């Protein structure tokens, strides 16, 4: 189940006081339906994926409202993960270690996962500064020519979203509807709702839908593990390299992740 009031999390409240309010981030009913939509899409059961995604977006405004630009770009506690839109998330108290171990500008270029400016130019284009995700998550730091990835940086605040890791986003449901909708009007309406809440120019033609969906997955899910599986589902033979620049040629072997050693040691 999910609370009736929506995502009302009180900053500074004790864990007990906030316990029920955090249910919008747990694997609640709508998170299960969202996961169902994702799996149906992967299985190419498009009508079932569409129905499940529509059930989730039907409560978007009530339970998972769009994060505003002022919240995303707040100077003290920027909500870089668009937390109010998360259908399912995990709490990770050491989340900032992702940033300090791999992305902090305190590291030297050869010690960090540094994304070439050419990669960002390809996915964000000439209107990058209008995109809230670019403005909040990609920043030039002293000592580096390329932008550093700030999505998981330490907020130094008690904001409830400071330790959240996104698992399922409401935006993914709108992307699924855009991909599986029965007519172009519904498809454009669905993806444009996300674009409008990211500061991105709206689509006017369905001819751009496929390329825009690819572009949105690249921008929306960076650092969250979803992009790889989008590439795999679409069986893309070539993908952009986020670290080396240029493209990476893909095949069936590269799309199969190796099993962890802990799972193979005793087989």
Report each predicted region and the residues it spans.
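Structured, solvent-exposed acidic/aromatic patches
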Residues: 1-170, 184, 267
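Terminal alpha-helical segments
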Residues: 136, 183-185, 190, 203
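Alpha-helical junction/boundary sensor with strong preference for TPR arrays
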Residues: 59-63, 198-201, 217
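Extracytoplasmic/secreted envelope proteins and their assembly/folding machinery
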Residues: 29, 50-53, 188-191, 210, ...
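Long, intrinsically disordered, low-complexity segments
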Residues: 164, 206-267
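Active/binding-pocket-proximal capping segment
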Residues: 174, 186-198
């Amino acid at each position: 189940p999910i609370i009736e009031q929506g995502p009302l999390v009180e900053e500074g409240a004790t864990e007990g006081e906030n316990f029920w309010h955090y249910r919008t981030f747990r694997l609640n009913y709508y998170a299960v339906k969202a996961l169902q939509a994702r799996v149906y899409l992967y299985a190419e059961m498009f009508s079932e994926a569409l129905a499940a995604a529509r059930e989730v977006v039907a409560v978007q405004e009530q339970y998972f409202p769009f994060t505003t630009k002022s919240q995303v770009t707040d100077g003290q506690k920027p909500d870089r993960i668009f937390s109010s839109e998360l259908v399912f998330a995990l709490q990770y108290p050491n989340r900032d270690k992702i940033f300090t171990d791999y992305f902090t500008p305190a590291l030297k270029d050869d010690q960090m996962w540094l994304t070439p400016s050419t990669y960002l130019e390809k996915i964000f284009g000439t209107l990058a500064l209008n995109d809230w995700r670019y403005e909040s998550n990609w920043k030039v730091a002293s000592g580096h020519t390329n932008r550093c990835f700030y999505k998981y940086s330490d907020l130094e605040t008690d904001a409830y979203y400071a330790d959240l890791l996104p698992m399922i986003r409401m935006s993914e449901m709108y992307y699924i509807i855009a991909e599986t909708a029965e007519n172009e009007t519904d498809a454009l309406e669905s993806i444009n709702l996300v674009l409008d809440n990211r500061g991105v120019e709206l689509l006017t033609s369905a001819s751009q839908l496929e390329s825009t969906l690819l572009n949105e997955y690249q921008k929306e899910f960076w650092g969250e593990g979803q992009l790889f599986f989008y590439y795999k589902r679409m069986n893309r033979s070539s993908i952009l390299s986020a670290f080396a620049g240029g493209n990476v040629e893909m095949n069936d072997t590269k799309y199969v992740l190796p099993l962890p050693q802990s799972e193979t040691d005793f087989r």
